[in-house]
Structure formats: structure tokens, C-alpha cells
């Protein structure tokens, strides 16, 4: 079954399968299923077309998902960078934003190590 351009895994419970859509977490998934009147433990493969349609309608009306949510996220980061705040500068320099240490660690954010040549050892005679 496809929702918001994402193929949901048929063998999983509805509440878990909905979290495969970017922008929908467990809480949102539970709220969607509650509004649609669907049991969260029901598997996606067992859902009728009417139930799938109800889920699609609720998501289309109330939630920003997939490309729309990613675009909003990018705009939020771009805004921080444009106003020149500390968080924006950290994003611009590809450094950790939330106060983590950077002398060691932070490899995920900084990327692969850029090696710097050390001092050459003097040859003893």
C-alpha cells in the first residue's frame, strides 16, 4: 500500500508502518489511526481500501510529509544561516550545532579526517 509516495511494509502493524513516511512518528501515527477508527495493531496487508483512503485523507489534510516536510526543514536551517546566529554559523561550518565537543569525536558531522603531517624525527648519528 502506498501513502504519500511511500510503499508501506505489508507485514508490519499500521502504527509502525506509518512511521516509514517522513514527517510521521509514532505519536502522529497513533493519532491518525485513532481518527480513522483503525486498530493500531492491524497489519497493513489486512486493511481495506476504505481504511487506506481514510488514512490518506487525514494525512493530506493535516500533515506535512515527505518532500514538504524536508523542504520546511531545509528552510529552517537556511533561515538560521541567513540571520547569522550561532546555530546558523555551526551549520555553515558543518560542525555540531548542539554544544557537543569537537576536539575529539564529532566525526559524523565533520567528515573524514584531514591528516596533517607531523614533525619529522631527526636522524641520530
UniProtKB/Swiss-Prot annotation:
BP terms from Gene Ontology: translation
Disordered as annotated region, ranges: 94-125
Pfam family, one: Ribosomal_S13
GO CC entries: cytosol; small ribosomal subunit
Comp. bias (Basic residues): 107-125
Keywords: Ribonucleoprotein, Ribosomal protein, RNA-binding, rRNA-binding, tRNA-binding
Gene3D superfamilies linked to this entry: 1.10.8.50, 30s ribosomal protein s13, domain 2
PANTHER family the record matches: 30S RIBOSOMAL PROTEIN S13/40S RIBOSOMAL PROTEIN S18 (PTHR10871), SMALL RIBOSOMAL SUBUNIT PROTEIN US13M (PTHR10871:SF1)
HAMAP family: Ribosomal_uS13
Family statement: Belongs to the universal ribosomal protein uS13 family.
Subunit: Part of the 30S ribosomal subunit. Forms a loose heterodimer with protein S19. Forms two bridges to the 50S subunit in the 70S ribosome.
This protein's name: Small ribosomal subunit protein uS13
Organism the protein comes from: Prosthecochloris aestuarii (strain DSM 271 / SK 413)
Amino acid at each position: 500500500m502506498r501513502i504519500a509516495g511511500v510503499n508501506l511494509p505489508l507485514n508490519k502493524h499500521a502504527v509502525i508502518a506509518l512511521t516509514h513516511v517522513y514527517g510521521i512518528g509514532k505519536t502522529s501515527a497513533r493519532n491518525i489511526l485513532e481518527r480513522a477508527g483503525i486498530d493500531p495493531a492491524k497489519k497493513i496487508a489486512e486493511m481495506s481500501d476504505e481504511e487506506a483512503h481514510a488514512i490518506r485523507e487525514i494525512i493530506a489534510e493535516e500533515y506535512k510529509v515527505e518532500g514538504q516536510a524536508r523542504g520546511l526543514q531545509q528552510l529552517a536551517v537556511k533561515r538560521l544561516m541567513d540571520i547569522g546566529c550561532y546555530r546558523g554559523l555551526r551549520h555553515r561550518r558543518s560542525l555540531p550545532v548542539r554544544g557537543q565537543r569537537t576536539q575529539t569525536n564529532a566525526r559524523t558531522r565533520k567528515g573524514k579526517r584531514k591528516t596533517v603531517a607531523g614533525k619529522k624525527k631527526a636522524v641520530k648519528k
